[in-house]
Amino acid sequence: MLYKRNPQLNKNGELIHLLSIEGLPKDIVTHILDTAANFTSVSDREVKKVPLLRGKSVFNLFFENSTRTRTTFEIAAKRLSADVINLDIARSSATKGESLLDTIANLSAMAADLFVVRHSESGAPYLIAQHVAPHVHVVNAGDGRHAHPTQGLLDMYTIRHYKKDFANLTVAIVGDVLHSRVARSDIHALTTLGCAEVRVVGPKTLVPGDMAGMGVRVCHTLEEGIRDCDVIIMLRLQNERMSGALLPSSQEFFKTYGLTPEKLQLAKSDAIVMHPGPINRGVEIDSAVVDGKQSVILPQVTFGIAVRMAVMSIVAGNEA
């Protein structure tokens, strides 16, 4: 019954769209991570390509700005030998009032095989997935506050790379959880993979009330939240999504919740520090931590290419 209800899976329980980590079986999440591990060596080859998506057309539709996600999706698709089309939304018919579904219908008429979609409206990738032909696939590159599944997966890949097993890990997610689609995807992924304890850390104004129901421990002080942690995932303040005075100031936030080398000593000595980017140095994290030996922020970006290669190759290989 789970497979039939989940719009990401076909009747055989195979992944045909990646819309959210929520509801994905553990074996599919693990399969994506295992597949990504096989792709990490591609970047070391003289010819950085494999032929898995040769002849396929991948359309990147980013209705919100992006640097890391858009670029790594483009690199990933090209390394899979796909033809990549980056739609310039600012110059597209979307600015002339064309609806999202009409945009998709017209691009589908151009023989699109896979849409990578980032949109400010939660649920936009789901809507698209409901209206594309059976051979067309949709990957969510971030929708509103809802989900950012490939970021969640690359975060899990990073954690597994450095920590191997989730069963004994304590992971803290710190910062603007309220507006973070990454936090939600990370929480779903961590709980699916059997992480021992997930902590959500931030001021009451930036932690949604439903967090406890997601199986996490809520902490409102950084000291409590990161004490004896194995992994710390820092989140930026998403000022562009804030409509009210949720914080006194960025300086006050850094004083209370900013991760400094001194505060990092509360975590385990071999703890790793992660961040989905973009980083705001001196707001949620000190430069000395970003550039320090416990930071794995740049490896996250590198692993993101392999993870996105894995996702696209898997969904494109399955039919609805």
UniProtKB/Swiss-Prot annotation:
Its EC number is 2.1.3.2. Keywords: Pyrimidine biosynthesis, Transferase. The keyword Cytoplasm does not apply. SUPFAM superfamilies: Aspartate/ornithine carbamoyltransferase (SSF53671). It is an enzyme of class 2 (transferase). Heterododecamer (2C3:3R2) of six catalytic PyrB chains organized as two trimers (C3), and six regulatory PyrI chains organized as three dimers (R2). NCBIfam families: asp_carb_tr, PRK00856.1. This is Aspartate carbamoyltransferase catalytic subunit. It comes from Variovorax paradoxus (strain S110).
